[in-house]
Every structure is written in structure tokens, then in C-alpha cells.
């Protein structure tokens, strides 16, 4: 899956993703996405961050390592964004593909959750790097209609994955708060 508002940064990015996808235990691979200003837009998704799911390291300089080098190293996550995502066709078919109940938001997180529920890994590939001109494809949630749709998608996700939301993201330290940016300790 690839948004029309992305641009490849490294010619080896697709080959790198394919390498992970060829491992039988891997179900999905996502890329590092970088804003035009050189900061990170996506380096993995944390389940429950900000309520449903949030991007790790958003706004961090793309050359920075981040907490325990997780922004700079390929590693497993609960989810990755579909703005640039590779999934073997057999895995995609096995889980029933994208859920049509999500017109815009959370379809990628839902797909990753379904893939993980089948025992596959979701991998963030830090070496597959793309520019992402976010919201050029989907726009912003800036009208009452879009906000109502977004609220409905939140409710759909919660009804389907509440148990997993309650249990917390297995790849995220429970000592970090879920209401602020990822990997930052809250002040008391």
C-alpha cells in the first residue's frame, strides 16, 4: 500500500522492505516517513497512544536515534502506517484485507492488528525511507462531517479491539504515559 503523497528517498527502500516480507514470520513491513522539513512523521505506531494509536517519534529530527535507538533501528511494532506498507498477498488475503468500516482512519492499524492476531510480526523498517506530505491524500478532519466520520471510526476500532487497548501495547513500556508524545516521561 502506498499513498500518492509519498516520495522515495532511497532507491533501495522497496528491496529492503521486500527482504523483511520474505521472512515467513513477518506479515507487514512499514517504512520511516519523513516530513519535508526533515523531521519524522512515522517510525512505528503505538497502540493506545493518544487514545487509539499514535505515531512514535513524530517531530523528531530524522537523523536522531530516539529512545533506545528505536527511531534509527528496524524493530517490531504493534502497527505501522499504510502510507507506505508492504504485506504479502497471501497474508493480506488470509486476514480479509482492509476493513471497509474504516473509510479513512485506523484501517492500517486494524489491518496490523488482524495480521498480529494470526501470529505474524509487524516490522518497522528504519532503512526504508520516504518523504510523506501528510494529509495531501486524505485532508484534515476539519469539517463536522469529517469529524463525525472520525468519531465513528474510533468507536468501530474500540468495539473491535478494546481488549487489546486495555492490555496495552506489548512493544511499549507501560511506564510511559499514553496521553503525551511517545517515549517521554510525564512530569508530576
Show where each model-derived region lies.
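C-terminal, non-catalytic tails of nucleotide-sugar-dependent glycosyltransferases
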Residues: 27, 37, 49-76, 122, ...
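Short glycine/serine/threonine-enriched helix-capping/active-site loop
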Residues: 29-32, 125-126, 133
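Short acidic (Asp/Glu) and glycine-rich catalytic loops that position anionic groups and cofactors
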Residues: 131-137
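Conserved donor NDP-sugar-binding/catalytic core segment of glycosyltransferases
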Residues: 6-50
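Non-transmembrane alpha-helical segments in soluble domains
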Residues: 18, 44, 112-113, 154-158
Amino acid at each position: 500500500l502506498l499513498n500518492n503523497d509519498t516520495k522515495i528517498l532511497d532507491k533501495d527502500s522497496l528491496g529492503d522492505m521486500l527482504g523483511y516480507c520474505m521472512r515467513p514470520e513477518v506479515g507487514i513491513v512499514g517504512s520511516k516517513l519523513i516530513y519535508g522539513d526533515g523531521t519524522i512523521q512515522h517510525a512505528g505506531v503505538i497502540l493506545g497512544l493518544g487514545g487509539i494509536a499514535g505515531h512514535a517519534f513524530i517531530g523528531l529530527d530524522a537523523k536522531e536515534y530516539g529512545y533506545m535507538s528505536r527511531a534509527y533501528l528496524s524493530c517490531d511494532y504493534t502497527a505501522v502506517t499504510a502510507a507506505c506498507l508492504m504485506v504479502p498477498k497471501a497474508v493480506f488475503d488470509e486476514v480479509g484485507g482492509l476493513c471497509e468500516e474504516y473509510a479513512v482512519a485506523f484501517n492500517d492499524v486494524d489491518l496490523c492488528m488482524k495480521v498480529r492476531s494470526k501470529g505474524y510480526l509487524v516490522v518497522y523498517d528504519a532503512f526504508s525511507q520516504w518523504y510523506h506530505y501528510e494529509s495531501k491524500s486524505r485532508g484534515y478532519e476539519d469539517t463536522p462531517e469529517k469529524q463525525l466520520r472520525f468519531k465513528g471510526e474510533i468507536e468501530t476500532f474500540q468495539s473491535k479491539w478494546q481488549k487489546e487497548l486495555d492490555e496495552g501495547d506489548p512493544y511499549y513500556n507501560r511506564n510511559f504515559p499514553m496521553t503525551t508524545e511517545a517515549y517521554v516521561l510525564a512530569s508530576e
